[in-house]
Amino acid sequence: MKDKPAKGTPTLPATSMNVQNAILGLRGRDLISTLRNVSRQSLRHPLHTAHHLLALGGQLGRVILGDTPLQPNPRDPRFSDPTWSQNPFYRRGLQAYLAWQKQTRLWIEESHLDDDDRARAHFLFNLINDALAPSNSLLNPLAVKELFNSGGQSLVRGVAHLLDDLRHNDGLPRQVDERAFEVGGNLAATAGAVVFRNELLELIQYKPMSEKQHARPLLVVPPQINKFYIFDLSSTNSFVQYMLKNGLQVFMVSWRNPDPRHREWGLSSYVQALEEALNACRSISGNRDPNLMGACAGGLTMAALQGHLQAKHQLRRVRSATYLVSLLDSKFESPASLFADEQTIEAAKRRSYQRGVLDGAEVARIFAWMRPNDLIWNYWVNNYLLGKTPPAFDILYWNADSTRLPAALHGDLLDFFKLNPLTHPAGLEVCGTPIDLQKVELDSFTVAGSNDHITPWDAVYRSALLLGGDRRFVLANSGHIQSIINPPGNPKAYYLANPKLSSDPRAWLHDAKRSEGSWWPLWLEWITARSGPLKAPRSELGNATYPPLGPAPGTYVLTR
């Protein structure tokens, strides 16, 4: 694998919406308040507004005369059809849209708004401009062609899809054909057994898929916001099967999908439940110090467990930790507090406690509005304008299979983003013990995504710096989920690595080397060096203390 200098990768993420905003929620009143603020600025500074209106008028005049001063992003698939550039009507319509988009962006950028209000205005007008894109109308050339080719049936199917989504999907277009998948059938289908269950989780032990296995097991901690089978999708995308085929012992946590009865489950509850799963893993494997892997909020829970064990002088029960797109340092370089203030945070806590849970569908909606062109308008065109069935992608099915968060954990996560407690010793207390991550002297391997809009890579990088021990950091050229599900064989995949961790993410990036392909083989080399000798695997799952309770994927994952 040839190393190349890292080039063309942004030094900082460009998003202003992230996981903090997703769990906080997005209220209509906040958007209306932003619109009012923009209107006030327009009235207070009429010369500024007039300047941009004149500029817009001049550009529209050039468009009417047939000039094409603006070009869409060549990577924007919305306008890839040749009709947008070859047909005079469509070309002028696209140019007018691009001119409007440019001037609204410049008006906001050059306004007297402060940084936070400017970020809110950009977010609001990005939503508006994305919605107003001419590709979202029935005049979309692809929709017109499909209408004629189908004899009008595409419109009939599109209206049927729209009515169904209004009734059954909260008015958002479906992203996936759910009929194509079944949990335990063609998803989460790797053979194994539930070997431990408590009120919050089930522990799955997988059957070996190699002639020999390493002695030290790996315990995987998925995020609580979604279900565990992000690690066990279809066979070609299954991280679990990749690990098993390469000789690793794998245990998997499957979190229970809580309901209002479980509103008091907080971070300490999850850490305590995870510690019980760790004990079961140690007992069944006969190994005193398993390796751990955590993703997103699962990584936060895993770090809290390690800090808890360290405070009890029991950190020897863990050998190493792998963090996948996990935030431990919740400070963002971009304006992360987009619509977050003390009043909004407390209102979000009260709302979820009254309901008992934060509905996963609500979180999914916010995530969708973070990337509306990819996650909303793309499917608007496909499902409604073209009248097509949404695609059958395993990752999209998993994404739609959302879970709830208990109110107490929701409140703990909001406080985590508000207070950033892990950046100083004893800033966070879990299960009655203060947490100091610098004292967690374990080998760690951290993965972030350069295009991650949920957990920005520079914040994940700073999170790695909070840990003690020997640390590795890898930056994949993917988004949040694709940074985890990164199987070998993707010709577009690459990652950046630099063994020297600087205090500044930009400095690390400047000296990082680019390697083609997936980061999985690099991590496999790292983890196998910490997984003990190879030995013949046991033929039976569980043991006398923890007998099998049922086949994988268990029962908790099936709860909607």
Swiss-Prot record:
Keywords: Acyltransferase, PHA biosynthesis, PHB biosynthesis, Transferase. Its EC number is 2.3.1.-. GO terms for molecular function: acyltransferase activity. GO terms for biological process: poly(3-hydroxyalkanoate) biosynthetic process; poly-hydroxybutyrate biosynthetic process. It comes from the Bacteria. Pathway: Biopolymer metabolism; poly-(R)-3-hydroxybutanoate biosynthesis. NCBIfam families: PHA_synth_II. Belongs to the PHA/PHB synthase family. Type II PhaC subfamily. This is Poly(3-hydroxyalkanoate) polymerase 2. The lineage of its organism: Bacteria, Pseudomonadati, Pseudomonadota, Gammaproteobacteria, Pseudomonadales.
